[in-house]
A protein has these predicted regions:
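Boundary/entry segment of secreted carbohydrate-active catalytic domains
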Residues: 1-11
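Conserved alpha/beta-domain cores
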Residues: 9-25, 32-50, 66-68, 162
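Conserved anion-binding
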Residues: 2-3, 68-160, 164-166
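Hydrophobic beta-strand scaffold residues
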Residues: 56-57, 109
Length: 166
């Protein structure tokens, strides 16, 4: 069985999540919590997930001004998370500073470029002048320069990304 799997805890009930993890924790590599979970559960409930001795991936997609981004990253230390996501649109300086703070607390920051639900039309409506593929590449280069641990991408983008950030 492939153990390179993080289970997404995108259900509302903490009881349900703990029961599921009790059943499958030996067959997974980690636990992913997204906005649905994060906004419903307390820091204490997030910490409860640590009892399974698996890395916790905090998929909060932080996107804010530099100081707030840095403080948000620092606050994750108390939650015992191993990975967290930041939007690459935060820009190089903010990402570099956040990456430096993350390394101090042994947190791996992963960059989110263009949401997979976006198409060229949507990007254009938001004022972006480049198509999705080119925008993704531009943001990936920023992530690499800012020394992020990695990026989140569509499986369709992997080949393209490896050309600019091996």
């Amino acid at each position: 069985m492939n153990k390179n799997i993080f289970v997404a805890c995108d259900v509302s009930s903490q009881k349900e999540i703990l029961e599921l993890l009790t059943q499958i924790h030996t067959r997974i590599s980690g636990i992913k919590i997204g906005l649905q979970y994060i906004t419903k559960h307390s820091p204490e409930e997030i910490k409860q997930l640590s009892k399974f001795n698996k890395p916790i991936f905090y998929d909060g997609k932080f996107f804010d001004i530099k100081n707030t981004l840095i403080e948000s990253v620092k606050s994750l230390k108390d939650l015992n998370v191993s990975y967290a996501t930041v939007h690459l649109l935060n820009g190089f300086e903010s990402l570099k500073a956040a990456s430096e703070e993350a390394r101090k607390i042994n947190l791996r920051l992963l960059g989110v470029s263009v949401l997979t639900s976006f198409d060229n039309y949507e990007l254009e409506q938001l004022g972006f002048k480049y198509p999705v593929e080119e925008q993704v590449l531009r943001l990936i280069k920023i992530a690499e320069k800012a020394n992020l641990y990695g990026v989140i991408c569509s499986p369709l983008e992997i080949k393209m990304i490896k050309k600019v950030a091996p």
